[in-house]
Amino acid sequence: GTLPASRSMIRALLTFWKFTRPHTIIGSALSVTALYVLVLAQPGGVPAHAQVWLPSLLAALACNVFITGLNQWSDVEVDRINKPWLPIPAGLLSRSVALTIVLMSLMVALLVAAWVSTFLFGLIALISVLGWAYSMPPIRFKRHHFGAALAITVVRGLLVNLGFYAHYMQQLHGHLTLDPIIGPLTGFVALFSIGIAWFKDIPDTKGDAEYHFGTLAVRMGRGSALVLGAVVVVLAYLAIIIPALVGLLPYPAWYTLSFGLPLIAFVTMAARLEV
């Protein structure tokens, strides 16, 4: 009856949600939205309307599902060891259905981006190509810690920040003028992404070593990867906090504080970790 069908639908939606890797979806949504608000706050633009933000967000999220889904689809055997709870190794999702979701997500991302603007289409296409190169042979950046960190940094640090900022500026203001905050923010996210690229492999050393993935945690040990990643993340925070404190950057006190508090929390948690 209706109840079993409803339960099946809920299970399917939950499986899809897990397949999207929710933390990446949330991160992408926050980045794309924050950049929109930043551009919107600049004087002289057109009035706020969802016609720019919503389709841009949809294209970004669909592209995110394509990249994370392709990563899982290409890594089933490794994930049986490292992440057996993910939908494919857990038997909740077949590889064929997963591939269908991946390809449909790519199609949605490109079609929506093309509808919005040629620039956004090119941006989403470039991000998708790098996402493919991250997971798929012959390039497969993720097999080597430098390639993985470089790919993640280019996408998260440069293309998303600078690309979506330029896209919104063109749509809302008709020209590209860089806000002074964009450079430091892009540098921060780029450095932060390097640390994250090293951190995320720390729990996965067993499967990565067995399948010859040259991650930093496999090559140098989990403890060294944690320390190096922590150093890079702390440097990212300090690089944006110190110039503001000495007056080199025109940030208000609350802005500097908004970076300082997470830094304190991060250092505190990192000091307690045992790997």
Identify what each model region corresponds to.
Residues 2-275:
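Multi-pass alpha-helical membrane architecture of UbiA-family
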